Amino acid sequence: MSTLFISDIHLCSDRPDMTAALVRFLERDAPGADALYVLGDLFEFWIGDDDPNPLHHAIADAFAALRQRGVSIYFIHGNRDFLLGRQFAKRSGMTLLADPCVIDLYGERVLLSHGDLLCTLDLGYQKLRRITQLKWLRWLFLRLPLTRRLAIACKMRGQSQMENVQKSQTIMDVTPAAVDALLRQHGCQLLIHGHTHRPAIHDFTLDGQPARRIVLGDWFEQGSVLVCSPGEQRLEQRTLPSLNPAGAHESDNL
């Protein structure tokens, strides 16, 4: 009995090793789970469900195959794939969730989020995030030609990379006050999120009670998976195929 959490895979055509690692994970490891939660940034960017990119079809098929094996799949949008829509979700067998959302994890209320909404010190990013949440702007963008959408996405991606180089690590991380406030708002003591690419389990005290924040890692150099079972949360590392064709993985108990 286990539930799996992943995020920040950032799939793109330039990194077939990451695609192979995810597909292998979906085929070999995930079928034994009760459920799989993908907490955003599954793709490096997403310009619409109508994008004919073969990578998208392959990933949708891999998730659909997992769903057919009885594993429930849930998805929270990230800042890279916030335009991923119901068409792709339906084909993949995914259920789309709001950000944040509360789930029942083996009898415990657990708060899930991609995590970017907690980086409150990054004022420029939070302003951009509010703009990208505008429904009318999304509607307009999705009606542009695919080539135009791709050009805009590539430009924004490049600008983001340049800006992040100049930002301090503190600004790009979540703020403790935002974490505390969100947990209080939803009546939870456990938060699971991604976005920052800093996998760790943080134990702290919230209003006199033990609390925990679990951060998922990215899949740039190795896969990061959170395995939860009744009474236990464990972060695991999965080796990418190009580094270890045998498909071994290492576990870190934190």
Swiss-Prot record:
An example Gene Ontology CC term for this record: cytoplasm
Keywords, alphabetical: Cell inner membrane, Cell membrane, Hydrolase, Lipid A biosynthesis, Lipid biosynthesis, Lipid metabolism, Manganese, Membrane, Metal-binding
Metabolic or biological pathway, per its Swiss-Prot or TrEMBL entry: Glycolipid biosynthesis; lipid IV(A) biosynthesis; lipid IV(A) from (3R)-3-hydroxytetradecanoyl-[acyl-carrier-protein] and UDP-N-acetyl-alpha-D-glucosamine: step 4/6
Pfam families per record: Metallophos
EC number: 3.6.1.54
InterPro entries, alphabetized: Calcineurin-like_PHP_ApaH, LpxH-like, Metallo-depent_PP-like, UDP-diacylglucosamine_Hdrlase
Essential cofactor(s): Mn(2+)
The keyword Lipid biosynthesis is assigned to this record: yes
Record text on cofactor binding: Binds 2 Mn(2+) ions per subunit in a binuclear metal center.
Metal-binding listed as a keyword: yes
Membrane topology: Peripheral membrane protein
UniProt: Mn(2+) 2 binding residues: 41, 79, 114, 195
GO molecular function: manganese ion binding; UDP-2,3-diacylglucosamine hydrolase activity
Binding site for substrate: 79-80, 122, 160, 164, 167, 195
Residues holding Mn(2+) 1: 8, 10, 41, 197
Protein localization: Cell inner membrane
GO BP of this protein: lipid A biosynthetic process
Catalyzed reaction equations: UDP-2-N,3-O-bis[(3R)-3-hydroxytetradecanoyl]-alpha-D-glucosamine + H2O = 2-N,3-O-bis[(3R)-3-hydroxytetradecanoyl]-alpha-D-glucosaminyl 1-phosphate + UMP + 2 H(+)
Family to which this protein belongs: Belongs to the LpxH family.
Function recorded in the entry: Hydrolyzes the pyrophosphate bond of UDP-2,3-diacylglucosamine to yield 2,3-diacylglucosamine 1-phosphate (lipid X) and UMP by catalyzing the attack of water at the alpha-P atom. Involved in the biosynthesis of lipid A, a phosphorylated glycolipid that anchors the lipopolysaccharide to the outer membrane of the cell.
Name under which the protein is recorded: UDP-2,3-diacylglucosamine hydrolase
